[in-house]
A protein has these predicted regions:
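Conserved beta-sheet core of the metallophosphoesterase superfamily
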Residues: 227-307, 315
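N-terminal secretory signal peptides and thylakoid transit peptides that target proteins
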Residues: 5-32
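Active-site-proximal beta-strand elements of phosphoester/diester hydrolases
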Residues: 66-79, 187-196, 221-225, 284-289
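Extended active-site neighborhood of metal-dependent phosphoesterases/phosphodiesterases
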Residues: 51-56, 119-193, 199-202, 212, ...
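Membrane-embedded segments
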Residues: 67-154
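N-terminal signal-anchor transmembrane helix
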Residues: 9-11, 15, 42-97
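Active-site neighborhood of phospho(di)ester-bond hydrolases with catalytic His/Asp-centered motifs
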Residues: 72-73, 103-107, 133-139, 174-176, ...
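Active-site-proximal loop/helix segments of hydrolase catalytic cores
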Residues: 197-217, 223-244
């Protein structure tokens, strides 16, 4: 047998093994997205992350220098099972360990029905904040996806029940109104509006009504569920809104985030301001990625969020 024939037979012998190896590698690569989805369904939706921001303001009252704000949004308690209690409790414990001065919830307590909140009231009542717990409505809190957009009576009943539940856990629900947080002789205003969103979402948020007691020179924080409200009205509003806190987008519960390098989700094509901190001139918007989930029963790359913001006075 000459060398040429030996080489040909050797190639024939090992070619199927090479094909098998390449097939296995290809299968492994192809399975990565599938495994990512499985991971997101089993663990990702409970992989709570604390997102920290320090924001400086020239006109923050000195008494509020270092004031710590905690924010949750889009808890969607109707998506969870009671077997998830311990996992969700861990997220609440993470928030409480931050020892916030004030707690804000920026809408979407439920998916459709107020009653979805009821089993979770004892757990949500465990949230602690020294100066109070303030909440607003999101589009899902209206019940429009269950009762229809024209059934105003049922919507109002749903909202009233949600307000009762919020009161039961010591969350003060603001519906186009404001309140003051006082420290010594200084104060800041917390403004809360009903849902206002671009497109077919409810546009009940009335910034003029909600800020009627705000004076020139006041320091103002706005709670508004949908971040599209910021670009549509808030950033150019004649009364200065220093910081707006929103949610709504969930970061689509899918995307890629590499801190300091990349942040992408398909939701960016619907909401340009879809997650984290944005600034327009001297006004800030923070968009929380959501604590719960809706639709897809998981999170891939965009993890459930607990926001901690420290307000600082510029020296």
């Amino acid at each position: 047998m000459n060398g040429k024939n030996l080489k040909e037979k050797s190639s024939i012998k090992y070619l199927p093994q090479r094909r098998k190896a390449v097939s296995l590698i290809g299968l492994g690569i192809a399975s990565i997205p599938f495994l990512g989805v499985i991971e997101g369904i089993i663990w990702g939706k409970f992989d709570y992350r604390i997102r920290r921001k320090i924001i400086y303001f020239d006109d923050l009252p000195e008494e509020f220098d270092g004031y710590k704000v905690a924010q949750l949004s889009d808890i969607h308690m109707g998506s969870f099972n009671i077997e998830d209690y311990k996992k969700i409790e861990r997220g609440i414990q993470m928030l409480n360990e931050e020892n916030p001065d004030i707690f804000f919830f920026t809408g979407d307590s439920v998916n459709n029905y107020a009653e979805e909140l009821k089993p979770w009231l004892p757990l949500l009542k465990k949230i602690k904040a020294k100066d109070g717990k303030i909440s607003i409505l999101g589009n899902h809190d209206y019940g429009i996806y269950a009762y229809g957009v024209d059934n105003v009576k049922k919507q109002q009943e749903n909202i009233n029940k949600i307000q009762e539940f919020h009161e039961e856990i010591n969350w003060q629900l603001l519906k186009n109104e404001s309140l003051q947080i006082k420290k010594e002789k200084s104060y800041i205003n917390i403004i809360g509006v009903k849902n206002w969103g671009e497109g077919n979402f409810p546009k009940d948020g009335d910034l003029e009504l909600a800020s009627k007691n705000i004076k020139d020179g006041d320091f103002n924080i706005l709670l508004s569920h949908d971040p599209s409200h910021f670009d549509a009205h808030v950033k150019t509003y004649y009364k200065k809104i220093h910081l707006t806190l929103s949610g709504h987008t969930h970061g689509m519960q899918f995307g890629v985030e590499i801190p300091g390098i990349a942040k992408w989700s398909p939701v960016k094509y619907r909401y340009p301001k879809w997650a984290d901190l944005y600034k327009e001139k001297d006004r800030y918007l923070y968009v929380n990625r959501g604590f719960g989930y809706l639709g897809f029963s998981g999170r891939v790359g965009i993890w459930p969020e607990i926001t901690i913001i420290e307000l600082k006075k510029t020296v």
